[in-house]
């Protein structure tokens, strides 16, 4: 037993193997439905959908479950909540609907998969988590827009001005992080307003993630008042190309601050930023007289606040010499009017020097300025002496000592000589006192001009050039000479050190050296010029050992940090400014370092870290270390915020060490992008990107770029080593594994560069031998176990023109019909082996009068028709110009065989004679034979057939043999009693077209008596005469083809044609023993065939339609079951041509925009002229020819309530263009409704079809017009988009729209004027209600709701190419003030002659009165001249203004060391000459009276209207006023019709007076007290400066300067440079007044309200809040940066700010 139960070793091994198999089976079954990763759930990743895409795969792509889903397991998805989102495809999940992670806040999807093991039926449910990855598909969206802020101009640089910018991005991770920056605006965005600009560069966003806007540059309200900042919000997608952004606009309004002193203003002052430098006034009083209000020169005392705050000004005397000046003079503290309170005598004082103070009345700092006032006490004057100089211009160095001589251009001293005409040669010469209008120079006793003041400064604000006048005065008599003008130029010397402005203490927050921050900017000024004024900056010293922590820009003076600054540190920076001469100055900048708020987040050392890690890296191994530093030195905490969804990495919160915490698998994921956040204790954070690349072994093949495959290259033949092309492959591996070498087979004529992949030719190629090569290029990487990649290459060899054309055929035989002109005979074709063939065909041999050859195509055509009967064959030899050889292939022989055509009709041989027959002759008896022949050369055109065509009963009793022409008796003649028959025999051929001739045969019948014994037996005698000798050829069609024309109106079941069958027999009572059938062409079953004796009938079964098909080609076949059918003629073709008929009516084409259903809509306007096109209707007719030609006619509607509306219009009969026939100004009964009729058949009445449509015409008024604005597109850009624009309007309104026109965009300026922008477009349109058929008012509720409400208007922002609709408004238009006078004169033949006589009498009377008036005026004028010659008086001198023209070189310069200049004015007539210098001419020809006639302007003389006259009424013109110009701009532009008035009386003869009447300016005093023009004394030389439009303000017509005849009124804006700005209105030739937006603030200074004229002189009724103080010359004045139009000084229009010129006039 023991032995029996023991196991042998062999049995033990077998049992052990069986046990292993059983365990394997059990374990294999138990693994089914298990998760391959060993987890209890499955985690997958999938990207969210882009729009509606659902094809994205999961990661991993299949469910990691053991088992084959087709054979081993069954899988089902279970969604406990909601609808299914995925479906299973094997183990792959496929989306059923798009995923939107952002809108649905969908971060993951949880569901289950049910897995059933098929073998056991065991079921298991596995949870599945699908994580939805975000993609960057949402752009940031700004919140709470629009953005706008107002900041004062004094805001320091670095101040945060706006913190409310916020944009949200719906994406997650870095895709949802938003950063902000300021972008440069478009050029057109800042050109709308004068004082607006793009804020790019002026403002900045220091921290992009916060979006806080700070000031980057100093603000200046006087320059820019509004900034537009383009704010861009961008997300931070990993790939910068995928980043999305949006933009908005921040409007920054600059508020003015009280930072400018007041300034005196008057004509000719030197200005610096709108402020007069060294203002000086002068006045004179006669000794012993009390004048009251004094006349001040150059103008009344006036000061203004340079800030827009416009504070009131208080005037006072600050000081004066002599000290008793206050006893004699006082100044009004409000108006600045200077008064004399007590008479003064020359013994008391001859001159008073007073300092006038102008102080702002404001709550803040009391800013003030001063001016010098000189009051002269005038003695009695005598005859003046005459002074002359050696030169008019001199030169001297600045800072020259007193007594330095002034030299001329040649180095000679300038000397003076004085003579007196009153002194004889024997009289002793007095010692004259030379008086100069400048204290800077003097004349020595010997008459030499020398320097009279120390430290004459050429540098600003000094003028640099002195233009003054010299007067020689007698000490005893005080008689003065006429003024002599001189100019002295100061030459620059480097005598000014740069001056550094004081810098307030600076506070700066602590920071590290990673950023260079601006501390401040120092500015130095050097009053020298040229190289002497070039300043360089340097840091001289820094306290606290901080010399290495600050730098300064040597050119700009910007001080910036460059080292780490700690809170609590203080530094004193000594800055030195040095010019080229070594002169320097220093200033100290105090800098304090403050800790500041926690405003800066930690910053990573690098924004992006690139790291590599092997996929075999151990867990907890270090990947890299990131480090961020906080500017405030706060502790930093690190975290991973994105990219670590698989939890394979971790970062140390304090150390920043990134480690691996799970095994990496490069085959699953090759790269990771982690977003790390560094956050300080204050909650501020920043992020950095860590790109981790998982390295791998060489497991990738080189791959050629798929977009370039297959490679196809081209190379010219005959070139060795020519470049063919470059192939390129890439290897996903790295290092040596990615180094690729290229190779190609060695048996081809090409080589390849193993490194670059460039393929070259190894030898010269021949296109003719082989024009294409195909081979394979191999790319191999550099790894030891190299991998390969291949690509196919095709090289096309390009041919060069080295071959001549050859013909492949030697001969071509063609057949063409005769009589065909321009018939295509054949097309010959030569072959040029070159790839760019050049072939020109030519006829070498042949009849050139009958044939021609196309040079390019090789087409051979007939020139005229050929004649078969004349010549049956033609031979042509054709060659090419490129090949002049005669060998084989050089030419081709074209043999043309002419085919005969049926062009000759049959002709009877003889004229048949009458035939007499007895009535007893039997049926079939031949009574005559009429043979005919056909001249055509071929069959069937020369085959003749015969038939009887009439007349009467003849066809009943006679018949003709169709082949022979034999006429037989057909029926018993006894049946009729007729004795004569006319038999017409028609001989026709079988050609196409069929031709025929007819011959008449008269048959006389002789009737015989009938006999019963001689009864005629009518047995079928024809049987004996019809032997079938022709059956040998069988049945056949008579012709190969037939053609017939059929009208399209032919009825169904009609016979179209009988097709004859040759050799057919009469079938008797039965059907014929043959039949015809269709082979092709009858696909629609339109035709049918029926058999008949000797032929087949072609029948029409269905109706024809020419418009659908105009011809049919049928193929027929002949068959017979009894008789033989000739196989050569058993088929034929039938061509059926359908003839068109008028069976279609016209149909109107209703334009969607102006028509609806059966109605056309259009409009007219009141201004529309006669014969204006308003509409074009179109109708189409499907018929052809004249049947499709449409004509148009207008008809009145019977139900129309307006009589004859068509009388207002006319329509072109041919084109359908509707034009106006009348004017519509007085017509109000609209809409007009009438009919238009379209008639075909070219308008013929008979047989035509008609269609009518309605036309509705409305009258368009302004209330119906609307404008759709496109601010970014010109009208030329939108010309081609009418349809899109009108579709937009129809869609939005549901009405019928029409576009009236396109024009440049117009908008209202602040002053009410219309401004035109040619770069934008206004689309003028109107709307018609299709229900009422009337125009819709723009105030209609439907317009309000569909277009004008904000919600509806936002929907109009649809975009065309390069254009976007903005809004809808009423259109603006410049109203042309052109009065069109149209007089409708009805001439009465009886009254008209008397009317002409009456008009003639009135003209005669008025002419006589005018002549009398002229004579009286001339007499008075002569008397006046006579009195003037006899009158003489002495007068004291007058003082003239100092015209100091200077423009500030920089905004930082201040008015200091103001010079005082003594001035005098000689009140003499001033002509409007153009000389630039003051010239005096005392020649005899210019003086009809003595110098004593010069009368000075006094208060008394002009107030009372008596006294002496001003010399402005005299012809003695002794001075020339020059208009100072800098840029030659037309500052005092004349826009009137009369542009060339040469008025020598352009200086007023009126005195400066204070009139109690309401005069705008004391220079003008008309008798009625109405407001007159401002009169500028001796300055303005143009008629536009001193007038209003005639009749508007009661101008004194006698005033020589009022220019009462000027037809137009100009409102001009004259800026500091004299330019006419873009907003200035001009006066056009039609007299149109165009208002302008003027002044620095763009305010409306020229507003006129009704007929009232506001007070322009601030001396009377001035209110600081009233902005309607107008310039009485209607000219706004831009003085520097300020608008002085409200003050009433017209001369400021002609000011030019010369930088170096001072003009003093006497």
Curated annotation (Swiss-Prot):
Q: How does it assemble?
A: Interacts (via the cytoplasmic domain) with ck. Interacts (via the cytoplasmic domain) with Cul1 and Ubr3.
Task: Mention any one GO cellular component term assigned to this protein in its UniProt record.
Answer: microvillus
| Name of the gene encoding the protein in the UniProt record | Cad99C
In its UniProt entry, the species of origin is given as Drosophila melanogaster
Question: Can you tell me which residues are glycosylated?
Answer: 105, 188, 442, 553, 620, 753, 1053, 1088, 1108, 1311, 1367
Q: Which Pfam families match?
A: Cadherin (PF00028)
Segments in the Cytoplasmic topological domain: 1417-1706
- Where's it mainly located? membrane
Please name the GO terms of the biological process aspect recorded for this protein, alphabetically. Answer: apical protein localization; calcium-dependent cell-cell adhesion via plasma membrane cell adhesion molecules; calcium-mediated signaling; cell-cell adhesion; cell-cell adhesion mediated by cadherin; chorion-containing eggshell formation; follicle cell microvillus organization; homophilic cell adhesion via plasma membrane adhesion molecules
Q: What happens when the gene is disrupted?
A: Females display reduced fertility as well as defective eggshell development. Ovarian follicle cell microvilli are abnormally shaped and display a range of defects including decreased length, reduced number and an irregular distribution pattern, leading to impaired vitelline membrane formation. In the intestines of 3-day old adults there is no formation of endosomes and consequently no DUOX-dependent up-regulation of reactive oxygen species (ROS) in response to the ingestion of bacteria-derived uracil.
Induction pattern? Up-regulated in the adult anterior midgut after the ingestion of bacterial uracil. Strong up-regulation detected 1 hour, 2 hours and 16 hours after ingestion, whereas no up-regulation was detected at 4 hours.
Keywords (alphabetical) are: Calcium, Cell membrane, Cell projection, Endosome, Glycoprotein, Immunity, Membrane, Repeat, Signal, Transmembrane, Transmembrane helix
Membrane topology, as annotated? Single-pass type I membrane protein
All ranges on the Extracellular side of the membrane: 29-1395
> Regarding domains, what does the record say?
The extracellular domain is necessary for conferring apical characteristics on the salivary gland membrane. Necessary for regulating salivary gland membrane expansion and tube length, but is not required for cell rearrangement during tube elongation. Sufficient to promote the outgrowth of follicle cell microvilli and the formation of microvilli bundles Sufficient to promote formation of microvilli-like structures in the salivary glands and the follicle cell microvilli bundles. Dispensable for apical localization.
Query: What start and end residues bound the annotated signal peptide?
Result: 1-28
> Any idea which GO molecular function terms this record carries?
calcium ion binding; myosin binding
Location(s) in or outside the cell: Apical cell membrane; Endosome membrane; Cell projection, Microvillus membrane
Q: What does this protein do?
A: Cadherin that functions in epithelial morphogenesis and the intestine epithelial immune response. Essential for female fertility. Regulates the length and organization of apical microvilli in developing follicle cells and salivary glands. Function in the follicle cell is essential for egg development as the microvilli secrete eggshell material such as the vitelline membrane. Acts at least in part by regulating the recruitment of the myosin ck to the follicle cell microvilli.
Q: Which residues form the Cadherin domain?
A: 68-142, 143-264, 277-387, 388-500, 519-604, 605-704, 707-807, 808-908, 909-1005, 1038-1148, 1156-1270
Protein name as annotated: Cadherin-99C
Ranges that cross the membrane: 1396-1416
């Amino acid at each position: 037993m023991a032995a029996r139960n023991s196991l042998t070793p062999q049995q033990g091994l077998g049992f052990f193997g069986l046990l292993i198999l059983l365990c394997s089976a059990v374990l294999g079954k138990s693994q089914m439905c298990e998760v391959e990763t060993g987890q209890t759930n499955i985690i997958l990743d999938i990207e969210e959908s882009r729009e509606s895409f659902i094809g994205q795969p999961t990661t991993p792509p299949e469910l990691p479950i053991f088992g084959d889903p087709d054979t081993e397991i069954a899988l089902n998805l279970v969604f406990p909540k909601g609808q299914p989102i995925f479906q299973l495809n094997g183990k792959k999940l496929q989306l059923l609907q798009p995923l939107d992670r952002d809108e649905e806040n969908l971060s993951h999807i949880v569901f289950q998969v049910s897995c059933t093991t098929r073998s056991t039926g065991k079921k298991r449910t596995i949870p599945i988590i699908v994580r939805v990855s975000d993609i960057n598909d949402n752009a940031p969206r700004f919140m709470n827009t629009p953005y706008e802020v107002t900041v004062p101009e004094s805001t320091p640089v670095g101040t945060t001005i706006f913190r409310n910018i916020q944009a949200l991005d719906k994406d997650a991770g870095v895709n949802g992080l938003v950063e902000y920056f300021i972008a440069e605006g478009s050029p057109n965005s800042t050109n709308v307003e004068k004082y607006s600009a793009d804020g790019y560069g002026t403002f900045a966003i220091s921290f992009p993630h916060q979006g806080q806007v700070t000031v980057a540059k100093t603000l200046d309200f006087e320059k820019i008042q509004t900034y537009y900042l383009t704010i861009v919000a961008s997300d931070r997608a990993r790939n910068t190309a995928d980043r999305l952004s949006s933009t908005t606009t921040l409007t920054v309004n600059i508020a003015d601050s009280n930072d400018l002193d007041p300034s005196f203003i008057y004509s000719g002052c030197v200005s610096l930023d709108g402020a007069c430098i060294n203002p000086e006034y002068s006045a004179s009083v006669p000794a012993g007289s009390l004048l009251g209000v004094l006349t001040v020169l150059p103008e009344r005392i006036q000061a203004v606040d340079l800030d827009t705050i416009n504070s009131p000004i208080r005037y006072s005397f600050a000081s004066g010499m002599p000290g008793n000046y206050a006893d004699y003079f006082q100044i009004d503290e409000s108006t600045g009017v200077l008064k004399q309170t007590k008479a003064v005598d020359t013994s008391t004082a001859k001159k008073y020097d007073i300092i006038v103070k102008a102080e702002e009345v404001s709550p803040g700092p009391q800013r003030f300025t001063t001016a010098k006032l000189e009051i002269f006490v005038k003695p009695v004057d005598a005859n003046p002496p005459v002074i002359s100089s050696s030169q008019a211009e001199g030169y001297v160095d600045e800072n020259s000592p007193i007594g330095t001589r002034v030299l001329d251009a040649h180095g000679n001293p300038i000397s003076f000589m004085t003579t007196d005409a009153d002194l004889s040669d024997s009289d002793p010469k007095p010692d004259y006192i030379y008086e100069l209008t400048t204290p800077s120079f003097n004349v020595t006793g010997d008459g030499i001009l020398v320097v009279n003041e120390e430290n004459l400064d050429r540098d600003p604000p000094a003028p640099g050039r002195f233009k003054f006048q010299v007067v020689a005065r007698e000490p005893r008599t005080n008689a003065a000479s006429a003024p002599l003008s001189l100019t002295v130029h100061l030459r620059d010397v480097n005598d000014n050190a740069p001056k550094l402005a004081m810098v307030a203490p600076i506070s700066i927050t602590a920071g590290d050296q990673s950023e260079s921050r601006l501390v401040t900017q120092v500015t130095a000024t050097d009053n020298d010029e040229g190289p002497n004024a070039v300043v360089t900056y340097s840091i001289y010293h820094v306290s606290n050992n901080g010399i290495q922590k600050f730098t300064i820009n040597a050119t700009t003076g910007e001080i910036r940090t460059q080292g780490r600054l700690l809170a609590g540190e203080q530094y004193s920076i000594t800055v030195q400014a040095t010019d080229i001469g070594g002169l320097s100055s220093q200033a100290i900048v105090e800098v304090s370092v403050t800790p500041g708020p926690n405003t800066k987040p930690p910053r990573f050392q690098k924004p992006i870290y690139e790291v590599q890690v092997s996929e075999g890296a151990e867990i907890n191994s270090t990947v890299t270390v990131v480090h961020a530093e906080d500017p405030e030195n706060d502790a930093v905490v690190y975290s991973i915020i994105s990219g670590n969804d698989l939890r394979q990495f971790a970062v140390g919160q304090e150390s920043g060490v990134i480690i691996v915490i799970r095994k990496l698998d490069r085959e699953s994921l090759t790269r990771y992008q982690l977003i790390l956040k560094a956050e300080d204790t204050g909650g501020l954070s920043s992020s950095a990107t860590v790109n981790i690349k998982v390295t791998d072994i060489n497991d990738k093949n080189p791959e050629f770029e798929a977009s370039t495959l297959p490679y196809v290259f081209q190379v010219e033949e005959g070139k060795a080593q020519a470049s063919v092309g470059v192939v390129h492959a890439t290897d996903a591996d790295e290092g040596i594994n990615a180094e690729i070498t290229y190779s190609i087979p060695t048996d081809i004529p090409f080589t390849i560069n193993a490194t670059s992949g460039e393929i070259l030719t190894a030898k010269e190629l021949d296109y003719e031998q082989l024009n294409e090569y195909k081979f394979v290029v191999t790319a191999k990487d550099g790894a030891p176990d190299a991998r390969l990649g291949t690509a196919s290459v095709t090289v096309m060899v390009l041919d060069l023109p080295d071959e001549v054309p050859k013909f492949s055929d030697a001969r071509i035989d063609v057949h063409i019909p005769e009589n065909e002109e321009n018939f295509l005979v054949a097309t010959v074709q030569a072959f040029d082996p070159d790839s760019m063939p050049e072939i020109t065909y030519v006829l070498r041999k042949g009849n050139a009068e009958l044939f021609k050859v196309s040079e390019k195509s090789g087409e051979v055509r007939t020139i005229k028709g050929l004649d078969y009967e004349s010549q049956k064959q033609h031979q042509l030899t054709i060659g090419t110009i490129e090949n002049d050889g005669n060998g084989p292939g050089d030419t081709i022989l074209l043999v043309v065989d002419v085919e005969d055509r049926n062009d000759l009709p049959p002709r009877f041989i003889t004229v048949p004679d009458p035939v007499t027959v007895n009535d007893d002759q039997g049926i079939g008896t031949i009574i005559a034979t009429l043979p005919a022949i056909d001249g055509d050369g071929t069959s069937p055109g020369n085959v003749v057939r015969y038939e009887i065509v009439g007349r009467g009963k003849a066809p009943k009793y006679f018949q003709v043999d169709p082949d022979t022409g034999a006429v037989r008796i057909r029926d018993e003649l006894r049946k009729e009693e007729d004795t004569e028959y006319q038999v017409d025999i028609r001989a026709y051929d079988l050609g196409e077209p069929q031709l025929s001739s007819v011959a008449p045969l008269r048959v006389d019948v002789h009737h015989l008596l009938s006999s019963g014994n001689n009864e005629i037996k009518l047995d079928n005698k024809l049987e004996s005469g019809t032997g079938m000798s022709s059956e040998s050829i069988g049945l056949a069609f008579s012709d190969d083809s037939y053609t017939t024309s059929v009208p399209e109106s032919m009825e169904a079941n009609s016979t179209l044609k009988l097709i004859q069958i040759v050799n057919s027999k009469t079938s008797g009572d039965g059907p014929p023993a043959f039949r015809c059938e269709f082979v092709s062409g009858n696909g629609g079953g339109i035709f049918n065939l029926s058999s008949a004796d000797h032929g087949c009938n072609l029948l029409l079964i269905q109706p024809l339609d020419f418009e659908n098909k105009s011809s049919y080609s049928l193929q027929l076949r002949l068959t017979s079951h009894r008789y033989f059918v000739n196989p050569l003629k058993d088929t034929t073709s039938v061509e059926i041509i359908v003839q068109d008929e008028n069976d279609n009516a016209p149909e109107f084409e209703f334009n969607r925009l102006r028509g609806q259903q059966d109605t056309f809509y259009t409009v007219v306007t009141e201004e529309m002229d006669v014969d204006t096109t308003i509409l074009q209707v179109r109708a189409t007719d499907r018929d052809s020819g004249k049947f499709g030609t449409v004509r148009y006619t207008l008809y009145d509607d019977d139900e129309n309530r307006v009589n004859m509306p068509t009388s207002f219009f006319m329509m072109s009969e041919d084109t359908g263009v509707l034009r106006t026939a009348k004017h519509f100004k007085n017509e109000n009964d609209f809409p007009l409704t009438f009919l238009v009729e379209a008639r075909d058949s070219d308008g013929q009445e008979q047989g035509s079809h008609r269609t009518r449509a309605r036309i509705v015409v409305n009258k368009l008024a302004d209330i119906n017009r609307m404008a759709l604005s496109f601010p970014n597109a010109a009208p030329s850009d939108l010309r081609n988009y009418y349809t899109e624009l009108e579709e937009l309007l129809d869609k939005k309104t549901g009405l019928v729209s029409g576009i009236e026109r396109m024009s440049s965009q117009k908008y209202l300026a602040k002053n009410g004027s219309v401004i035109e922008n040619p770069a934008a477009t206004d689309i003028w349109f109107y709307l018609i209600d299709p229900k009422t058929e009337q125009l819709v008012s723009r105030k209609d509720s439907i317009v309000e709701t569909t277009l004008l409400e904000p919600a509806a208007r936002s929907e109009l922002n649809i975009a065309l190419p390069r254009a976007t609709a903005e809004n809808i408004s009423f259109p603006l238009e410049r109203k042309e003030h052109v009065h069109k006078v149209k007089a409708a004169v009805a001439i009465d033949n009886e009254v008209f002659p008397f009317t002409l006589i009456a008009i003639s009498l009135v003209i005669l009377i008025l002419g006589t009165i005018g002549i009398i008036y002229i004579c009286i005026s001339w007499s008075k004028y002569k008397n006046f001249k006579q009195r003037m010659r006899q009158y003489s008086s002495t007068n004291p001198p007058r003082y003239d203004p100092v015209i100091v023209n200077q423009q500030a070189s920089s905004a930082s310069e201040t008015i200091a060391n103001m010079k005082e200049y003594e001035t005098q004015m000689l009140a003499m007539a001033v002509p409007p000459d153009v000389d630039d210098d003051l010239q005096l001419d005392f020649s005899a020809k210019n003086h009809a009276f003595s110098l004593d006639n010069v009368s000075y302007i006094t208060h008394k003389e002009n107030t009372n209207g008596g006294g002496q006259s001003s010399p402005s009424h005299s012809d003695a013109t002794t001075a020339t006023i020059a208009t100072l110009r800098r840029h030659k701009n037309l500052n005092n532009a004349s826009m009137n019709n009369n542009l060339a008035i040469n008025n020598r009386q352009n200086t007023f003869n009126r005195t400066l007076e204070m009139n109690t009447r309401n005069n705008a300016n004391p220079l003008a005093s008309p008798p009625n007290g109405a407001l007159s023009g401002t009169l500028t004394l001796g300055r303005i030389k143009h008629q536009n400066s001193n007038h209003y439009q005639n009749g508007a303000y009661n101008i004194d017509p006698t005033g020589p300067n009022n220019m009462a005849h000027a037809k137009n009124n100009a409102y001009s804006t004259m800026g500091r440079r004299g330019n006419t700005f873009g907003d200035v209105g001009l006066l056009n030739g039609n007299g149109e007044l165009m208002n302008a937006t003027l002044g620095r603030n763009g305010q409306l200074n020229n507003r006129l309200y009704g007929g009232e004229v506001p007070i322009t002189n601030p001396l009377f009724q001035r209110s600081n809040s009233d902005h309607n103080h107008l310039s009485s010359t209607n000219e706004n004045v831009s003085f520097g940066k300020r608008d002085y139009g409200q003050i009433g000084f017209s001369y400021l229009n002609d000011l030019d700010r010369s930088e170096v010129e001072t003009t003093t006039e006497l």
